[in-house]
Amino acid sequence: MEFPDLGAHCSEPSCQRLDFLPLKCDACSGIFCADHVAYAQHHCGSAYQKDIQVPVCPLCNVPVPVARGEPPDRAVGEHIDRDCRSDPAQQKRKIFTNKCERSGCRQREMMKLTCDRCGRNFCIKHRHPLDHECSGEGHQTSRAGLAAISRAQGLASTSTAPSPSRTLPSSSSPSRATPQLPTRTASPVIALQNGLSEDEALQRALELSLAEAKPQVLSSQEEDDLALAQALSASEAEYQQQQAQSRSLKPSNCSLC
């Protein structure tokens, strides 16, 4: 007695057997019998989706877990940068010691990249204030600007210092003493920069630095070029002297009849 509605036929074209306990392929969702349910037996076209391999670190030979869809090379590289226990990886981590302080970033750099606003250290990708959502309030003056301001402050103090000859004698009688008028204090920024803006103060400081700069010492290449030029000029002078001596010692062929 047959039960045509019970079970299912195998999807393999060469089999087509009615199986009362059919099996479903988890890759292609086909129905197969127990003999053809394997990927290789029915030549499954979606078997590559189930071919999951775990990469192994080439330095410490430890399996590295990889998320689905993530390139294995990237996972192995991050493992070498963070968790690898081999000597080359640990030596590399000693060089890259400056960790990015942005939340979620584990990148390390050889040198510090400090934000001018918040003062924290970041990697190359998050060094700009917009990239790491900088919490620093306002715009701080740069180091060059601070140097220019201090230079301008020194110039202002020297230019505004009163000379001894211009000091007025104090009155002898207290009745003639005039009350001092209250002086208005300038804002700290204007007094610090002598009435100049930050850019003007920076330009003034750069001009003074260039004016006070000492003559640069010649490099080794320039010294070699100078010595070669002097040797050539000395050789040329010696050659001309020899030519002049040879002309003076050469006998004349002219004869007077």
From Swiss-Prot:
Phosphorylated by MAPK14. Phosphorylation has no effect on association with the proteasome complex. Disulfide bonds: none annotated. InterPro entries: AN1-like_Znf, UIM_dom, Znf_AN1. A motif (CAAX motif) lies at residues 254-257. Zn(2+) 2 binds at C25, C28, H42, C44. The keyword Zinc applies. Residues 155-179 have a biased composition (Low complexity). Changing S163D: No effect on association with the proteasome complex. It is a lipid-anchor. Its main location: endoplasmic reticulum. Residues 197-216, 221-240 form the UIM domain. Changing L202A: Decreased 'Lys-48'-linked polyubiquitin binding. Changing A227Q: Decreased 'Lys-48'-linked polyubiquitin binding. A zinc finger (AN1-type) spans 4-52, 94-142. Changing L206A: Decreased 'Lys-48'-linked polyubiquitin binding. The UIM domains specifically bind 'Lys-48'-linked ubiquitin polymers. The UIM domains mediate interaction with polyubiquitinated proteins. This is AN1-type zinc finger protein 2B.
